[in-house]
UniProtKB/Swiss-Prot annotation:
Source species of the chain: Pongo abelii
Gene3D superfamilies membership: Galactose-binding domain-like (2.60.120.260), Laminin (2.10.25.10)
Superkingdom of this protein's organism: Eukaryota
GO cellular component: extracellular region; plasma membrane
Protein name, UniProt field: EGF-like repeat and discoidin I-like domain-containing protein 3
UniProt key word Disulfide bond: yes
GO biological process, one term: cell adhesion
Length: 480
């Protein structure tokens, strides 16, 4: 802090300052407004080192500077404003130690100090989560997030499967440069077989032998944040085949493509692939990419270029992670229903609401309502108000009989008693969501605008066989 130094040699009462006896001339401090007393060389002499804005022998007057040409004049303690960085000066009977100063500075966010002169280092409190790197800025901070996280504080996870394995991404959305045909054309290894963990005799995509620059392409149908990819090989005629390395390209229109680069360079990134035909191998994109179309270009293959895969990422909002139906984070007691069904009226075949978890396995692996009508519901208590941005549904089989919900409505509540049915904003009526077409394929619906609520109800509106449901909610608990 700059200080003006007024040096005055005081002898006796000649300048109106009491004569001090022997001892410390600066005790008590004769300097006002936070001035620092400095003993002089001669007995009874001292000087006052005054803070900015104060003058006179004992720092008792405030300096007002109207312009470079005008002489300083005395004014109130807030003129000129002693507060830095946009701080607001307020007249106050304030003390700094034992000294009356007459004002306080109200500092804007990001600054502190008596005169708001210090920039706060927000990174000291480690605001960046999940391995994010914090950079302190002037009155602010920024977080550089790992590829699979996003948000101001890297608080949103963005690494969920985008739907190749589960079937949210349809066959028509998966295309390729070529298809391998074997056994006189009877076996066709189409691109839409390239689904992670797919089973069967023909369970992957294989490029044609004469395809010198093969690729497989995923159309996500809208721009999404893509943070990684999982690859897997397969066996063809008993022989392991897989992709050892590959490149990634992306596009927003399917025509103009950009290759994913090594960070900070213009060099195409070559990703490590698989080392056998069955073990999945994941690569993350740091930084992630935002695109509607993603292409994978095999570089080195074992025998033929054979692939099963999944893309990882989330909606652009970043708030579209599974809330815990499949993982079990949502516990059994949080899932209730209007009624339940028992096959053959036997307790061991009870289709309880707690079984309504996406991809649940077993003979009894879903919720089925006791009645087939439009008054049935499956309810999830999220325990706290939560932003819900999507839902995935799935049917099931009861002793070989295919059952699923073909369409449904959604309702939400914060107290579990008063419910609101989600509306179609354009048509201004209850929104009916498209459900499933079979018992096993995932069907995802985006909830836009999102729901903010603690309790969510799925209201079956049409069904095949019986109201049978496995499900997952997508969203996040919002944090600053």
């Amino acid at each position: 802090m700059k200080r003006s130094v007024a040096v005055w040699l005081l002898v006796g009462l000649s300048l109106g300052v009491p004569q001090f006896g022997k001892g410390d001339i600066c005790d008590p401090n004769p300097c006002e407004n936070g001035g620092i007393c400095l003993p002089g060389l001669a007995d009874g002499s001292f000087s006052c080192e005054c803070p900015d804005g104060f003058t006179d022998p004992n720092c008792s007057s405030v300096v007002e500077v109207a312009s470079d040409e005008e002489e300083p004049t005395s004014a109130g303690p807030c003129t000129p404003n002693p507060c830095h960085n946009g701080g607001t000066c307020e007249i106050s009977e304030a003390y700094r130690g034992d000294t009356f100063i007459g004002y306080v500075c109200k500092c804007p966010r990001g600054f502190n100090g008596i005169h708001c002169q210090h920039n706060i280092n927000e990174c000291e409190v480690e605001p960046c989560k999940n391995g994010g790197i914090c950079t302190d800025l002037v009155a602010n901070y920024s977080c550089e997030c790992p590829g699979e996280f996003m948000g101001r504080n890297c608080q949103y996870k963005c690494s969920g499967p985008l739907g190749i394995e589960g079937g949210i991404i349809s066959n028509q959305q998966i295309t390729a440069s070529s298809t391998h045909r074997a056994l006189f054309g009877l076996q066709k290894w189409y691109p839409y077989y390239a689904r992670l963990n797919k089973k069967g005799l023909i369970n992957a995509w294989t490029a044609a032998e004469n395809d010198r620059w093969p690729w497989i392409q995923i159309n996500l149908q809208r721009k999404m944040r893509v943070t990684g990819v999982i690859t897997q090989g397969a066996k063809r005629i008993g022989s392991p085949e897989y992709i050892k390395s590959y490149k990634i390209a992306y596009s927003n229109d399917g025509k103009t493509w950009a290759m994913y680069k090594v960070k900070g360079t213009n060099e195409d990134m070559v990703f490590r692939g698989n080392i056998d035909n069955n073990t999945p191998y994941a690569n993350s994109f740091t930084p992630p990419t935002k695109a509607q179309y993603v292409r994978l270009y095999p570089q080195v293959c074992r025998r033929h270029c054979t692939l099963r895969m999944e893309l990882l990422g989330c909606e652009l909002s970043g708030c579209s992670e599974p809330l815990g139906m499949k993982s079990g984070h949502i516990q059994d007691y949080q899932i209730t229903a209007s009624s339940i069904f028992r096959t053959l009226n036997m307790d061991m075949f009870t289709w309880e609401p707690r079984k309504a978890r996406l991809d649940k396995q077993g003979k009894v692996n879903a919720w089925t309502s006791g009645h087939n009508d439009q008054s049935q519901w499956l309810q999830v208590d999220l325990l706290v108000p939560t932003k819900v941005t999507g839902i995935i549904t799935q049917g099931a089989k009861d002793f070989g009989h295919v059952q699923f919900v073909g369409s449904y409505k959604l309702a939400y509540s914060n107290d579990g008693e008063h419910w609101t049915v989600y509306q179609d904003e354009k048509q201004r009526k209850d929104k009916v969501f498209q459900g499933n077409f079979d018992n096993d394929t995932h069907r995802k619906n985006v909830i836009d605008p999102p729901i903010y609520a603690r309790h969510i109800r799925i209201l079956p509106w049409s069904w095949y066989g019986r109201n049978t449901l496995r499900s997952e909610l997508l969203g996040c608990t919002e944090e600053e």
